[in-house]
């Protein structure tokens, strides 16, 4: 009840009261409702797929009222979509979610010197199924579709401007920081 009311509906936490949809937050929180109503997770997956750019990255957070959000170089956000799709399929045995078609967002890629950009992002004319959305996220995270999102000198994924541990934000904006946590997370998704 608390997760549904305070996190999914109110979009608020003790330290976050801006009312935005957080990409990773909403997906994580909706997974906690899987035994109560798996439809909540299904709906969040579909909703979040519409906040992915064609390059595979996603809005870190957004407001539905004005279609404004923030495009960032956080390294983990984009992987929450394939992770939760895999969890949904494992829990339900229903692969049909992979066939649902949704649009990507339009938006200029961040420049090398940009860490984030807040602006209005609207749906593009490019639509693909959830399976392709997941592939784009994984390819981006592995550096297949964008060399800036690759692995560092120790063979670990680059952290970008942060990973799941927000306390490590901005330790790798020059492309040198790596994330052990992200390595484990990516491995979990790929297996």
Q: Locations of the language-model features?
A:
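Acidic, mature catalytic/reactive cores of soluble proteins
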Residues: 1-191
């Amino acid at each position: 009840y608390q997760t549904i009311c305070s996190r999914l509906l109110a979009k608020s936490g003790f330290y976050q009261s801006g009312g935005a949809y957080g990409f990773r937050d909403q997906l994580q929180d909706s997974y906690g409702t899987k035994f109560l109503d798996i439809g909540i997770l299904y709906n969040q997956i579909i909703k979040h797929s519409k906040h992915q750019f064609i390059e595979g990255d996603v809005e870190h957070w957004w407001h539905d009222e004005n279609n404004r959000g923030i495009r960032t170089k956080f390294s983990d956000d984009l992987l929450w979509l394939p992770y939760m799709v895999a969890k949904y399929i494992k829990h339900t045995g229903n692969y049909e979610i992979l066939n649902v078609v949704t649009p990507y967002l339009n938006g200029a890629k961040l420049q090398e010197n940009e860490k984030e950009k807040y602006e209005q992002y609207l749906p593009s004319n490019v639509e693909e199924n959830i399976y392709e959305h997941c592939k784009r996220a994984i390819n981006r995270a592995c550096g297949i579709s964008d060399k800036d999102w690759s692995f560092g000198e120790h063979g670990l994924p680059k952290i970008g401007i942060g990973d799941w541990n927000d306390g490590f934000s901005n330790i790798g904006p020059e492309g040198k920081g790596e994330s052990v946590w992200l390595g484990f997370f990516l491995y979990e998704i790929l297996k």
